[in-house]
Amino acid sequence: MRSYMDGGGAAAYEEEEEEVEDDDGGGGGGGGGGGGGLGEKKRRLAAEQVRALERSFEADNKLDPERKARIARDLRLHPRQVAVWFQNRRARWKTKQIERDFAALRSRHDALRLECDALRRDKDALAAEIADLRDRVDGQMSVKLEAVAADEHQPPPPPPPPPLAYNSKVVDGSTDSDSSAVFNEEASPYSGAAIDHHHHQTPASYDTAGFTSFFAPSTTLTSSLSFPSMFHASSHFDGHQELLVGGGGAGAVADADLGGAGFFAGDEHAGGLSWYGAEGW
């Protein structure tokens, strides 16, 4: 048994068609003997009828009794044929809709899966970078802690040496350098102390006869030779005697007051310069 729809039909539609055909066959038999062959005639939908039903389905896939009767009247079909066609068309439409929805969902799922994989790779890369940075920070912190620990265990540097004290010692208001200078002045044969000692020495300690004979008086040489710079009151003997006022004694002060002439105050000293030219001349 074939259905009235192009492209096949459902079992429910075939059962509905059988019921319609049985009704038609029974009606034909009751009408007369010649009408018995009508029940065996098969009806098929024309192409125009199929296009009209498609337009009606696209407009509204719901089929109420009034609309079913109007479509059947316009297409010259039985109302039950119209109802079965709409039922089968809704089933195919639902199947195609499910297939379209499934394809869309599957494509969306694939896109989300790819995006999820990309996000997972990014997450793994970021986690590896974070771990690397954490290792670097831990290494730097460990190095700093080791340096701090080494600084703590290292003994402190020794204190700097104290500044060297000045070695000169002040004794009675004068330093060692001043004392050494005074000592050198006193040890010098030209110092005021030596001159004073020589001037005040007793005649018993000298060979007076030999000394006077050695320094024989020579009036000509004495008168011709003069040493103003050597025996002048402003000579360097005065400077030494002034420096040694505290240690040269009263004789040095007396010689300084005499303007340097105290060294050769006596006649024997004044004539003592004859040896410069007594024998050489």
Swiss-Prot record:
GO terms for cellular component: nucleus. GO terms for biological process: positive regulation of DNA-templated transcription. It is found in: Nucleus. Residues 13-25 have a biased composition (Acidic residues). Residues 1-10, 26-38 have a biased composition (Gly residues). Pfam families: HALZ, Homeodomain. Residues 155-164 have a biased composition (Pro residues). Gene3D superfamilies: Homeodomain-like. Residues 96-140 are annotated as: Leucine-zipper. Residues 1-46, 149-182 are annotated as: Disordered. Expressed in seedlings, roots, stems, leaf blades and panicles. Residues 38-97 bind DNA. Keywords: DNA-binding, Homeobox, Nucleus, Transcription, Transcription regulation. Transmembrane segments: none annotated. GO terms for molecular function: DNA-binding transcription factor activity, RNA polymerase II-specific; sequence-specific DNA binding. Probable transcription factor. Belongs to the HD-ZIP homeobox family. Class I subfamily. This is Homeobox-leucine zipper protein HOX8. It comes from Oryza sativa subsp. indica. The gene is HOX8.
